[in-house]
Curated annotation (Swiss-Prot):
Disulfide bonds: none annotated. HAMAP family: IGPS_B. This is Indole-3-glycerol phosphate synthase. CDD domains: IGPS. It comes from the Bacteria. The gene is trpC. GO terms for biological process: L-tryptophan biosynthetic process.
Amino acid sequence: MSQEFLARILEQKAREVEQMKLEQIQPLRQTYRLAEFLKNHQDRLQVIAEVKKASPSLGDINLDVDIVQQAQTYEENGAVMISVLTDEVFFKGHLDYLREISSQVEIPTLNKDFIIDEKQIIRARNAGATVILLIVAALSEERLKELYDYATELGLEVLVETHNLAELEVAHRLGAEIIGVNNRNLTTFEVDLQTSVDLAPYFEEGRYYISESAIFTGQDAERLAPYFNGILVGTALMQAENVAQRIKELQIDKG
């Protein structure tokens, strides 16, 4: 995702937020805490499985998928959390997908979107998300902290996404407990697992790290397993003929 493209997305989000009603806060969906689970299950590389119909880089991925059935297959095969794309314009997602999936699974769900405003956080929680995504590249450090604090006050966990060392340092300063490293270069749009490997020496004790993007095979997962608590996988699972088998290949035992 180029910086120019990210700017386009954020402009669209600003327009959406302007039209968005402030919802009444509903009760938080009950499930386990992701950070607690990662802390207590470090013997395996955990899989966060994503429901994603399309993306700007790949176009349509799987438009006809039964999203609830896909999510339940993820859960049945040991996914630690389900990531749900809710951006409509660029990813062909919908908030209703998050609502439907969250009502049919027991594990945590992540609202995968470009969050820039508190109204979006309330909507995510009301739709059943227990975790939201905040992208360092999309926010000033001050705004990031405001949204992070707001989400945690609402009982939500936050996956703070980074792309390089400078952003990783921002996440550390923030006190983020769960940190994502996205292997997609925001300038060139290319993906490279080496991004995750290169940032690993800067990881800190007491935090949980998730590698995102460009993870397709068991070999990819094995490369990341020494450094990461989990991986976020979308396209490989949405395209897989045998979803259950693909998840098992990605769940690397660390011994």
